[in-house]
Design a protein with these regions (language model features):
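Cleavable C-terminal sorting propeptides in eukaryotic secreted/cell-surface proteins
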Residues: 550-576
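Non-catalytic accessory segments of hydrolases
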Residues: 2, 14-189, 210, 313-315, ...
């Protein structure tokens, strides 16, 4: 009887909704751009949170400023209310569910949302840590609204941290480049940097500590977090990082010429006719001028389509960060070597790539994805599938499908996360590695080959919102949400996910580790495990060696065959 009462009490307390009274406004705060008021969430015993929604950090990047670096927001006179999301940056929004807020699009979209505790406790006098979150969406979709507001206030901000979410340009707006000053590229990353500058400049007016800023993001937001960790332009703007289910590996960055070529094909598809295509300089000027005149909704549509079609018929491409001479200079190896010396919390879900599969033809789909995400390396893809997948199992068995999907998960996510963790640990930075394993089946998850924690499964436990369906937590959900959010909040506060009263101590990855330990996060089963992904990452070294040996053998055989053919032809001519 007592335990049942405690269970009900836990759910009511942890997920108590804010009062439904008329809108209550916060006291005004004086930001660097003007005076601002937000709205108040009252969670009863959990406390009150001020939500300042849609504060601009940058001017509209439209007209001649489309495809350029962002500019700081203009100041305003008087006092403004910020109680609703600002417009989202343009993207193709498909199948929005009724429980999600309506989306307004505008190129004037560079804004932040700030959630800060309104603490009346006289004992809480210190400045609060700040958690800055970058949303995901494959770099072509999404906005800060997709992670919600009330859940962030209730789950995170009531734990005495300030949370900031932000909009940034996605798709063509965020990554179109000509490789020169006409469209330098990496606009999205420059947006994030400007937002971080805004947070640093305004931290104290919201009660925050500008010397204790944590940057975190999921999926493309995790990749962006890694990119910001490697950029020399962002040093000092944040002090710890937590990339979730995403990092910047070989699939996450490219040369400007690649995107320029694809965008030139797209422009021609839309009607662009260069005057003199042999002149790169002239074509770039004309190309950017043309693309600035295209309706933003049309660019958003084609930016989303570009993930699957490159307008030249040669396969897929992505709108992603590029190497440049400023934000991401040099090679990937040099960028990784120059990663900021800050504490790191990073990890994955147990079956990341499960989110990309239907129930049919799992093996064939896995081969296709593995080939694509190894940049068309069919030999590597097939060798990996042969190594990890037991083909004696029935193709419709859960174990067979798990083995297939884990290979794709490794290629897209796990290998680069593992590499980031080891490389950062070798620089003597404290690194905490995890795998999120908790999963609760719902009607929306029945379309997948099996039930398990997949890409994005963890988000609702941090933010209290699921884009695909209404999130109605039970006791297990509450337990996991409490665990996961506490780990992230502790990391924001102490650069360490362990709290002062943690029952399960989370040890960091050793700087000498070749098989790093990790925290397995699951309901009533969260514990430290000795080897990340059960040693799968080390097995990829064997696979790469096999492939390299096979390629060497093929090259030598081809060379010997050509030499033999040449020798035979020469001998034949001698005796004619």
């Amino acid at each position: 009887m007592h335990s049942a009462w405690m269970a009900v009490t836990t759910i009511v307390f942890f997920y108590s909704r804010p009062s439904a009274d008329a809108l209550t406004l916060t006291a005004p705060v004086k930001t660097t751009h003007g005076r601002a008021q937000g709205k108040v969430y009252d969670f009863g015993a959990k406390g009150k949170v001020g939500a300042f929604m849609g504060i601009p950090y940058g001017r509209a990047p439209d007209g001649e400023f489309r495809f350029q670096k962002p500019r700081p927001a203009r100041t305003w006179r008087g006092q403004r209310r910020f109680t609703q999301y600002g417009p989202a940056c343009y993207y193709l929004a498909q199948n929005r569910k009724e429980h999600m807020p309506p989306i307004r699009f505008d190129e004037d979209c560079l804004s932040v949302n700030v959630f800060t505790p309104l603490n009346d406790d006289s004992n809480v006098k210190s400045k609060l840590p700040i958690m800055v979150y970058i949303h995901g969406g494959a770099y072509v979709m999404g906005s800060s609204a997709t992670v919600g507001d009330e859940g962030i206030a209730r789950i995170l901000a009531t734990q005495n941290v300030i949370v900031v979410t932000l909009n940034y340009r996605t798709g063509i707006f965020g990554f179109f480049t000509t490789g020169d000053s006409n469209a330098p590229g990496n606009q999205a990353l420059w947006d994030m940097r400007l937002a971080l500058q805004w947070v640093n400049e305004n931290a104290e007016v919201f009660g925050g500590d500008k010397k204790n800023i944590m940057l975190f993001g999921q999926s493309a937001g995790g990749s962006a977090t890694h990119a910001l960790l490697m950029s020399p332009t962002t040093k000092g703007l944040f002090h710890k990082a937590a990339p979730m289910s995403g990092s910047t590996g070989e699939n996450g960055i490219t040369q400007p010429s690649v995107i320029r070529s694809q965008m030139l094909n797209l422009a021609k598809y839309l009607g662009f006719k260069p005057t003199n295509e042999s002149s790169t300089k002239d074509t770039n000027i004309e190309l950017v001028s043309f693309m600035r005149q295209v309706e933003p909704s049309k660019l958003a549509l084609n930016g989303a389509l570009s993930v699957n079609y490159n307008y030249s018929g040669n396969g897929q491409f992505k709108l992603i960060p590029v190497y440049d001479n400023e934000f991401l200079p040099g090679t990937l190896e040099k960028l990784k070597a120059g990663i900021h010396d800050v504490p790191l919390l990073t990890g994955n879900t147990e079956y990341e790539a499960l989110a990309f599969f239907g129930k049919e033809n799992v093996y064939e789909a896995a081969i296709g994805m593995a080939t694509y995400y190894t940049k068309g390396d069919s030999m590597l893809a097939k060798t990996a599938m042969d190594y990890f997948v037991d083909k004696s199992l029935p193709k419709d068995s859960v174990e067979f499908m798990k083995q297939c999907i884990l290979v794709v998960s490794d290629i897209i996510f796990n290998k680069d996360i593992y590499s980031l963790a080891l490389q950062s640990a070798q620089k003597k930075n404290p690194v905490y590695l995890y795998t999120f394993k908790y999963f609760k089946p719902t009607p929306a998850t029945q379309r997948y080959p099996f039930q398990g924690a997949m890409h994005c499964s963890d988000l609702q436990y941090l933010f209290g919102l699921n884009e695909n369906e209404v999130y109605e937590p039970d006791l297990d959900d509450v337990i996991v949400s409490d665990q996961l959010s506490t780990y992230f909040v502790n990391f924001a506060k102490f650069s360490n996910p362990n709290g002062q009263n943690s029952e399960q101590k989370w040890e960091p990855v050793s700087d000498e580790a070749t098989k790093p330990q990790y925290m397995s996060i699951d309901v009533n089963a969260t514990q430290l495990h000795p080897v990340f992904m059960d040693g799968r990452m080390e097995k990829w070294n064997e696979i790469n060696q096999q492939v390299n040996s096979a390629r060497t053998f093929t090259r030598v055989s081809t060379l010997l065959l050509s030499m033999y053919s040449f020798s035979g032809a020469t001998t034949q001519r001698m005796f004619v």
